[in-house]
């Protein structure tokens, strides 16, 4: 479909995002977890989702590996495909925000421009960049998927942090120390959500 096909007309919903938020009892936002492989993004995002669920918050977690089994199964790891991967996830996250959900995404998303692209799509005030800052040496020691070992052996090319750049956020809404206990990081995130009147429980 052409980007501006004149036969494709935007359909306005009778139920507004604000009405959906009122129904859920909280605001719809995206928490965009970014960091190196092994930094703890998925672990912290999963623990936060569990905590929010217990508080009665409507959530959904989009994980970098999971979406490549379906939504982005046709994409590889070239720069163009990686950008398209993030674009698609951003669109899905935006739809979920409009549905009034608290959306958690766990993606390396190494480039600032791509994260900014999603921020602009979702809109200021609804996009929370979460930088899980864990030293490369710690990430490599953890190596939960064995990817650093493969990258060091030359079996995996263009691996972020080894032979492909990671552009750390310059002004993330929250900067987490990935060496801290997960429970501490989850509490910091819950505090942020409450301080910004996103959740009330």
Swiss-Prot record:
One of its GO terms (molecular function) is adenylylsulfate kinase activity. Pfam families: APS_kinase (PF01583). Residues 1-23 are annotated as: Disordered. The active site is at 109 (phosphoserine intermediate). Its EC number is 2.7.1.25. Pathway: Sulfur metabolism; hydrogen sulfide biosynthesis; sulfite from sulfate: step 2/3. Gene3D superfamilies: P-loop containing nucleotide triphosphate hydrolases. One of its GO terms (biological process) is hydrogen sulfide biosynthetic process. It catalyses: adenosine 5'-phosphosulfate + ATP = 3'-phosphoadenylyl sulfate + ADP + H(+). Keywords: ATP-binding, Kinase, Nucleotide-binding, Phosphoprotein, Transferase. ATP binds at residues 35-42. Belongs to the APS kinase family. Catalyzes the synthesis of activated sulfate. This is Adenylyl-sulfate kinase. It comes from Escherichia coli O6:H1 (strain CFT073 / ATCC 700928 / UPEC).
